[in-house]
């Protein structure tokens, strides 16, 4: 299948149109028209080769929402017209112990990432959701619940599952004592999910700048980590702390906040941690397909709908909407036309605000 994507050719190049040849459908494949694709900060890291393993041309995008347009001969889960979602994985061996128990992200043979990876069979480079069409194994497509706004569902595929997985793994429920460090794209998801699970939620940040936003999202309390007295009073107060901060930082000051048998899960960290005790935290990869299906259920998904109106980028990179994306603000995600990809993607450079954004294919309603 020939389709159009948007790729970067080098670590310092902007996104540009790129012709993609999607594979012919295998028996268990579905082909989908991409309607929306979330913009994750991982996309920028990969495009800029921040981690040293980017393969160019690189087509980012792993928060993908679309509709099925064709199915393979053995597909049983989906039919043409179904709304589906694809996250950061598109394949795994499906027979190892981890895959059999729904932990495909821990596949013994290695899972296949949606982009910047190699197909398990052909070894061709995988290209992501910044494109008009995608072909994926049916086991790695998720059904989008009826009635859910497709644009707002996209960030569930990365930010959503990344924060939902530890809440589910550590059995958070009514009365659970949860701390969330940071209030960007991951942090606001963690707060809304934990609140929906009935937990008692405290948001932590260096200053009080995000206090009002945290409380508006449903958090019970706000804790400024630079307030020594408040931090001391909070000792032993949490059974789970989810650290969503995406830059190098010292986690040691948060360890005393954990109760006996408490856990600090680091989901936002990029790069090396400052000195710390590795026995005091967990760093699981984003959840498996089973977790993703739970995260995308109608009840959980509806709770994550953004309250803000969608923003649109203008072609003028100095236009007001572009400044709004560049500025540090409280908005969480924006549906954006793919035709405006240049100004938006470049607007993220050097500004790791952690917000989740969504691009819309310009041929979609």
Where do the language-model regions lie?
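Glycine-rich beta-strand-centered segment in the early N-terminal region that forms part
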Residues: 23-37, 50-100, 105, 127, ...
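NAD(P)H dinucleotide-binding glycine-rich loop of Rossmann-like/cofactor-binding domains
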Residues: 77, 93-181
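Adenosine-nucleotide cofactor-binding segment
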Residues: 174-183, 188, 193-253
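Helix-to-beta-strand junctions that scaffold the AdoMet/dcAdoMet cofactor pocket
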Residues: 258-259
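Rossmann-fold NAD(P)-binding glycine/threonine-rich loop
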Residues: 268-282, 294-302
């Amino acid at each position: 299948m020939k389709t159009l994507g948007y790729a970067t050719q080098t670590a310092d190049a902007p996104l540009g149109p790129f012709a993609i040849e999607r594979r012919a459908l295998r028996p268990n494949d579905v082909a989908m028209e991409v309607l929306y694709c979330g913009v994750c900060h991982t996309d920028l890291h990969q495009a800029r080769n921040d981690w040293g393993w980017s393969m160019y041309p690189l087509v980012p995008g792993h928060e993908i929402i679309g509709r099925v347009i064709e199915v393979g001969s053995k597909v049983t889960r989906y039919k043409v017209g179904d709304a589906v979602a694809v996250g950061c994985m598109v394949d795994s061996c499906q027979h190892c112990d981890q895959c059999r128990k729904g932990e495909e992200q821990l596949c013994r043979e290695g899972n296949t990432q949606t982009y910047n990876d190699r197909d398990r069979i052909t070894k061709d480079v995988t290209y992501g959701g910044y494109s008009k069409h995608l072909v994926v194994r049916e086991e790695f497509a998720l059904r989008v619940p009826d009635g859910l706004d497709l644009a707002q569902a996209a960030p569930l595929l990365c930010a959503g599952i990344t924060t939902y997985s530890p809440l589910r793994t550590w059995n958070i429920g009514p009365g659970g004592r949860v701390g969330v460090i940071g209030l960007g794209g991951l942090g606001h998801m963690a707060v809304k999910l934990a609140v929906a699970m009935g937990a008692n939620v405290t948001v932590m940040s260096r200053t009080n700048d995000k206090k009002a936003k945290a409380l508006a999202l449903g958090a019970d309390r706000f804790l400024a980590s630079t307030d020594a007295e408040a931090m001391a009073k909070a000792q032993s107060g949490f059974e789970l702390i989810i650290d969503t901060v995406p830059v190098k930082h010292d986690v040691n000051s948060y360890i005393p906040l954990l109760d006996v048998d408490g856990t600090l899960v680091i989901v936002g960290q990029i790069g090396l941690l400052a000195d710390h005790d590795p026995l005091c935290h967990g760093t699981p990869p984003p959840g498996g397909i089973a977790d993703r299906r739970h995260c995308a259920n109608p009840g959980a998904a509806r709770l994550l709908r953004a309250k803000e109106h969608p923003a649109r980028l203008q072609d003028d990179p100095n236009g007001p909407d572009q400044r709004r994306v560049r500025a540090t603000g409280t908005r969480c995600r924006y549906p954006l036309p793919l035709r405006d990809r240049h100004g938006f993607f470049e607007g993220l450079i050097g500004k790791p605000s952690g917000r989740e954004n969504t691009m819309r294919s310009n041929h979609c309603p």
